[in-house]
A protein has these predicted regions:
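Catalytic cores of carbohydrate-active enzymes across secretory and cytosolic contexts
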Residues: 1-205
């Protein structure tokens, strides 16, 4: 049920630790098995990449990570093991490709690869940027999961910042155009006819 209610946005690689931490919570605190927890996690997280510069794709020393977060490291290690099985199925006997697509490689943990292996959606912030991700930076991940990649210009979600956070405005909008706008933003264009309506403007203010 959780993926029907919540999407967690990994906005660049900085919040990536949320992925294995949610696995830990679901398994250790809620008693779920790996497969059930993984099915939830891989339908909750979405990843936005902001730059094609490799310097911005975070990686962390394995020894430090394992020392500070031993349980989370165990989960990341299992994520990587399962990823390696998948990579060998998709790109058999290509050890060089497996190495740079791995979550754990050369005694480092690669956060972008963790996102690519875990998120149901991956987007660049423009069509050109996304084309570069698909054709160059993340090309082999794109070939493996091409239905995960999108070009989306960043913005806010009106469902959270209007529908959830501003019930008065939500009620006003819905009273004029119905509730379909909550699922379809294009419906908001119906408000144009009220732009010069004194009563509506007074309520809006």
């Amino acid at each position: 049920k959780l993926p029907d209610k919540v999407v967690i946005h990994i906005n660049d690689t900085h919040p990536t630790m949320a992925i294995p931490e949610m696995m830990r919570l679901l398994m250790d605190e809620k008693g779920l098995g790996w497969d059930e927890a993984w099915d939830i996690v891989t339908h909750v997280f979405a990843y936005t990449n902001h730059t094609v510069m490799s310097e911005a794709l975070e990686k962390w020393p394995l020894d430090m990570f394992r020392k500070i977060l031993p349980r989370v490291y165990m989960i990341v290690e299992e994520m990587n093991r399962r990823l390696m099985i998948r990579l060998n199925e998709v790109y058999p006997n290509d050890s060089a490709k497996h190495k740079y697509m791995a979550i754990i490689s050369d005694n480092q943990i690669f956060m972008a690869n963790m996102c690519l292996a875990s998120c149901f959606a991956v987007n660049g912030v423009s069509k050109l940027h996304t084309d570069i991700l698909k054709q160059d930076i993340f090309a082999d991940y794109y070939n493996m999961n091409n239905d995960h990649f999108y070009a989306i210009t960043n913005g806010i979600t009106f469902r959270r910042w209007i529908a959830n956070c501003n019930p008065e405005l939500t009620e006003l909008i819905s009273s004029k155009i119905g509730k379909n706008w909550i699922k379809d933003a294009s419906e908001l264009s119906k408000l144009k006819k009220y732009a010069k309506d004194p009563a509506f403007k007074k309520q809006f203010a």
